[in-house]
């Protein structure tokens, strides 16, 4: 288990620190004070409407070993880009890497040609070429950008975006800090992926031991313990499969610094600080808290929410969260972000004095998955059909009512989306979900928006959940969809295969939406992994109950969970839709969504009046 690295400062950061220090000499500030006042991540902030970014390579030393990284303007993370809502930005991106690259502007509303996904938006940026992104800035808030080519995101191609609103900021603060969380490995990510394909549990060093078995004998009895072991062995799974890639190979970073690097933000007691958390990791869910200091959420995924005080939150991969903290005491506080599987943590410090630090909490014990607590009390497992008659599963559901929501819409087969298999209801399993690519199917998915998640349910303090939140100002769009699409999140952990509805991207056809239609997308997680699902170019308005919506760009779906969000297909083009766990996306949990004009003859009316399965 890896939780820290040597104290030596990599040359890259030493040189960067000299440059920042020189900038602040005329102000009479130390480099640390300059960083704190300007809200630096350790990378420079670039402001304006025209930017030049260079994608390249550099050697970095994060763990005591010098390893190659991909960089933006020579640094990891890349520079923070600060824009203003209503401006038009121009970004000239030059690729000095020996392979095709790209930049995707995560969560931004823009023309699809500017979205930065090779094969969908454009051809990518070839070595030695420059691509110019230009688009109007239609929103404000905290976002981020990253490569959408290969595994370059894992090796350092990511950075933060702050968009200032064109109207006065409703939350006045004294300091504004970006906090980028990420995961770094000295291994080549291609090797990591190849290892997962061969042995999916390779990086899990929290597996049960003989001592665990003996302890369970004492607590549960021999018979129940053996039954539990037999169940998990039959499923070819483990109750400790919380993360595919762990602290065995990962070092967890805060603003590019390892735990021993201890990224630090200085404040004056009594100040209001805005902390902009960005989970820019490839594979890691972080549980974030600041012992001794309350947080109040004001934005999620760049969108304002009704403020809610809390003490801890699980931030999914690719999500952002803006909070206000008001440290009044003359003391230091630890920013603590442990991985979901408790194999490591990122750490930083808020302090009134650079000489002061705070204790670092011990990590929690690794939590255990349970089929009941995950809503999987009635799971089917294995590649076979378990004696069920699936010949009746592939039938036309036209006219059948779907009653999972107050605004229910009927199901129908959609001729424009041929691989949307019909079902009796959202929890039924289509014929495509039986085969070598799917090793488990939930029969009783639950609504879990109020569930903090595995490892956080027994806290003595407030853990923030989706159910606590709603977009400020009320629903941002209609609550009434014209149709519903159902997607099951599927996979085979032992073979490291991931998909939607049992169909990997290589075999899937694009999902088609008509321009400006309102669609409900229902996700059912049939796997025992947590998945962050990201739809490019369009908002996902999560239905949190009582007519409330939470506007997001990335939605985390827990094991055995069923949730729904509403999408307004208001921008034409070809959009990516995928799990934001990098290796899951590469292993097949990816779809193309095409937003097209409706036929002029009105033949789409039937299509728009029915729901269907994806």
Which residues does each predicted region cover?
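Generic recognition of flexible, low-complexity loop/linker segments
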Residues: 78-79, 261-264, 274-276, 284-285, ...
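Short beta-strands and strand-coil junctions in structured, solvent-facing domains, enriched
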Residues: 99, 169, 186, 283-285, ...
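Short, aromatic- and glycine-rich surface loops/edge beta-strands on solvent-exposed regions
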Residues: 144-149, 332-340, 575-579
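Short, surface-exposed loop/turn segments at beta-strand-coil junctions that are enriched for proline
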Residues: 136-140, 326-332, 568-574
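Conserved small-residue hotspots that stabilize compact domain segments
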Residues: 291, 295-296, 320, 324, ...
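Histidine-centered copper-binding motifs that mark active-site loops
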Residues: 2-9, 16-317, 323-324, 354-403, ...
């Amino acid at each position: 288990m890896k939780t820290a690295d040597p104290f030596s400062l990599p040359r890259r950061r030493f040189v960067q620190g000299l440059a920042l220090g020189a900038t602040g000499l005329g102000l009479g500030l130390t480099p640390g004070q300059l960083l704190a006042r300007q809200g630096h991540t350790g990378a420079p902030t670039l402001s304006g409407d025209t930017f030049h970014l260079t994608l390249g390579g550099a050697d970095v030393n994060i763990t005591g070993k010098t390893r190659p990284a991909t960089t933006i303007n020579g640094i990891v993370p890349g520079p923070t880009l600060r824009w203003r809502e209503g401006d038009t930005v121009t970004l000239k991106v030059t690729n000095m890497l020996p392979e095709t690259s790209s930049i995707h502007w995560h969560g931004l509303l823009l023309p699809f040609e500017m979205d930065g996904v090779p094969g969908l938006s454009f051809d990518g940026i070839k070595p030695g070429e420059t691509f110019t992104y230009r688009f109007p800035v239609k929103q404000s808030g905290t976002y981020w950008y990253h490569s959408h080519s290969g595994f370059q995101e894992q090796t350092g191609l990511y950075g933060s975006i702050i968009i200032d609103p064109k109207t006065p900021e409703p939350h006045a603060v004294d300091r504004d800090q970006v906090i980028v969380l990420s995961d770094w490995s000295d291994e080549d990510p291609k090797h990591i992926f190849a290892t997962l394909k061969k042995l999916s549990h390779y990086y899990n060093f929290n597996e049960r031991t003989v001592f665990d078995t003996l302890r369970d004998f004492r607590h549960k009895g021999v018979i129940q313990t053996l039954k539990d072991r037999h169940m998990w062995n039959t499923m070819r799974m483990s109750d400790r499969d919380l993360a595919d890639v762990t602290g065995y190979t990962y070092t967890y970073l805060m603003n590019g610094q390892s735990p021993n690097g201890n990224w630090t933000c200085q404040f004056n007691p009594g100040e209001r600080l805005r902390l902009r958390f960005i989970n820019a990791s490839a594979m890691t869910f972080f549980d974030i808290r600041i012992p001794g200091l309350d947080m109040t959420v004001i934005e999620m995924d760049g969108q304002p929410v009704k403020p809610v005080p809390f003490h801890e939150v699980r931030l999914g991969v690719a999500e952002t969260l803006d909070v206000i903290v008001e440290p009044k005491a003359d003391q230091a506080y630890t920013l603590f972000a442990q991985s979901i599987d408790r194999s490591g943590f990122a750490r930083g410090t808020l302090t009134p004095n650079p000489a002061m630090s705070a204790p670092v909490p011990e990590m929690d014990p690794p939590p255990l998955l349970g089929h009941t607590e995950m809503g999987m009390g009635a799971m089917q497992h294995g590649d076979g059909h378990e004696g069920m008659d699936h010949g009746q599963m592939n039938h036309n559901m036209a006219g059948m009512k779907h009653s999972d929501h107050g605004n229910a819409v009927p199901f129908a087969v959609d001729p424009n989306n041929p691989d949307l298999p019909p079902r009796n209801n959202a929890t039924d399993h289509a014929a495509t979900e039986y085969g070598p690519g799917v090793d488990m199917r939930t029969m009783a998915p639950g609504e879990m928006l109020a569930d903090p998640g595995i490892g956080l349910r027994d806290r003595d303090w407030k853990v923030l959940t989706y159910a606590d939140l709603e977009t400020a100002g009320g629903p941002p769009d209609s609550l009434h969809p014209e149709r519903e699409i159902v997607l099951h999140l599927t996979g085979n952990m032992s073979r490291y295969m991931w998909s939607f509805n049992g169909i990997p991207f290589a075999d899937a056809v694009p999902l088609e939406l008509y321009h400006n239609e309102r669609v409900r997308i229902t996700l059912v997680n049939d796997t025992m992994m947590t998945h962050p699902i990201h739809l490019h170019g369009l908002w996902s308005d999560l239905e949190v109950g009582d007519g409330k919506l939470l506007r997001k760009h990335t939605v985390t779906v827990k094991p055995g969970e069923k949730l729904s969000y509403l999408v307004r297909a208001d921008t034409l083009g070809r959009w990516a839709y995928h799990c934001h766990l990098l290796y899951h996306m590469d292993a097949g949990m990816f779809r193309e969504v095409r937003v097209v004009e409706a036929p002029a003859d009105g033949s789409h009316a039937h299509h728009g009046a029915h729901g269907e399965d994806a």
